């Protein structure tokens, strides 16, 4: 329903905000872009760019240039959902793109273009969240692998580092030696804000992670120093060197990591987020309290950490099922004898 405020503005010739879906999408995207390097990560902006792209393609597919927000009903939500399903996208991915459309409607409400979000009561398809992580023997294979390619070695090294620290790829890219501190008892740890959420995390430095840092430091000193960090939107350059300086893009690093995984005989495609999940599951299996894991991983909510507890419980259940099955087979053999 059109608000009284909008009618008044139109009669007076006032149009302070975009009043169509695609125009609103571009404006919202621009506001996110302006926050990159401050309160938003570059990856967040890139993901939303694709949300905008798909929305544009959907409107174009309908044979129109744009859609006024004032005529939108719940039907459009279902039309867009069906369109995304035809693209062969997974349910979780579809939900993410639908959320962008709903976000635009909430923005229209805040700007008094419409009275309420027409999608407020719509249901999103429930998806079972499955996390991918490596077993200890696969991590050991990666650690034993010898790599001659410089970029592939960097990819391997960062993946192993993430397995023992839980750092996301964005946090490793921005990790400086100044983020590594020493406690009164001599224990070294990483203290840093997450690039994605700005939530501080504190994680003790595992001996393997510490060895990787020492190796990186020695290499950089041998080559005459590393790269320093330039924060987006700032002219000053910080003097602390990056632990993992890299001249290639993240996509190249991901491709190299995939090659490394295949070289180790690991069937699943490796990703840096898989390394983070590996840290979470290994920590939970080691009996570390969930509150401590949440702090180490920089989770804004402990609900994000609870998935690792679920994975560990499932693993225990599977192991027990195998044990029972083995016992039953042995019992059948004994009875047969």
Predicted regions and their residues:
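N-terminal DNA-binding recognition helix of tyrosine site-specific recombinases/integrases
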Residues: 54-58, 67, 75-78, 86-120, ...
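C-terminal catalytic core of tyrosine-transesterase DNA break-rejoin enzymes
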Residues: 160, 164, 170-171, 256-259, ...
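Catalytic-site neighborhood detector that most strongly recognizes the C-terminal catalytic loop/helix
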Residues: 133, 194-198, 297-322
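Short, polar N-cap/turn motifs at the start of nucleic acid-interacting alpha helices
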Residues: 179-186, 267-268, 288-307, 318, ...
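C-terminal secondary-structure termini that scaffold catalytic or DNA-interacting sites
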Residues: 219-238, 323-337
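C-terminal catalytic core of Y-nucleophile DNA break-rejoin enzymes
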Residues: 195-214, 227-232, 236-259
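Conserved tyrosine-mediated DNA breakage-rejoining catalytic core shared by Y-recombinases
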Residues: 129-132, 138, 174-215, 231
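Basic, Lys/Arg- and aromatic-enriched nucleic-acid-binding interface segment
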Residues: 95-97, 114, 119-169, 173
């Amino acid at each position: 329903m059109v608000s009284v405020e909008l009618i008044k503005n139109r009669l007076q010739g006032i149009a302070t905000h975009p009043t169509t879906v695609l125009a609103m999408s571009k404006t919202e995207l621009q506001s996110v872009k302006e926050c990159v390097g401050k309160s938003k990560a570059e990856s967040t902006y890139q993901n939303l760019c694709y949300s905008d792209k798909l929305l544009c393609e959907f409107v174009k597919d309908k044979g129109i240039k744009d859609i006024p927000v004032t005529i939108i009903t719940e039907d459009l939500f279902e039309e867009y959902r069906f369109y995304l399903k035809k693209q062969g996208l997974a349910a979780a991915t579809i939900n993410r793109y639908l959320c962008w459309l709903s976000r635009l409607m909430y923005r229209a409400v805040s700007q008094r273009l419409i009275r309420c979000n027409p999608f407020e009561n719509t249901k999103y398809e429930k998806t079972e969240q499955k996390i991918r992580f490596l077993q200890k023997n696969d991590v050991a294979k990666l650690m034993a692998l010898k790599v001659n390619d410089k970029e592939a070695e960097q990819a391997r090294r960062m993946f192993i580092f993430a397995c023992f620290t839980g750092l996301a790829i964005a946090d490793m890219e921005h990790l400086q030696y100044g983020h590594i501190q020493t406690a009164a008892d001599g224990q070294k740890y990483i203290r840093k804000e997450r690039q994605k959420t700005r939530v501080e995390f504190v994680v003790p430095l595992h001996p393997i992670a510490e060895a990787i840092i020492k190796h990186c430091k020695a290499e950089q000193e041998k080559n005459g120093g590393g790269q320093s960090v330039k924060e987006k939107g700032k002219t000053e350059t910080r003097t602390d060197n990056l632990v993992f300086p890299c001249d290639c893009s993240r996509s190249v690093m991901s491709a190299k990591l995939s090659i490394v995984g295949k070289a180790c005989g690991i069937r699943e495609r490796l990703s840096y987020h898989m390394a983070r999940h590996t840290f979470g599951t290994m920590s939970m299996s080691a009996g570390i309290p969930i509150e401590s894991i949440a702090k180490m991983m920089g989770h804004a909510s402990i609900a994000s950490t609870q998935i690792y507890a679920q994975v560990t419980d499932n693993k225990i259940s599977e192991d027990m099922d195998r044990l029972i099955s083995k016992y039953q087979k042995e019992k059948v053999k004994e009875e047969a004898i």
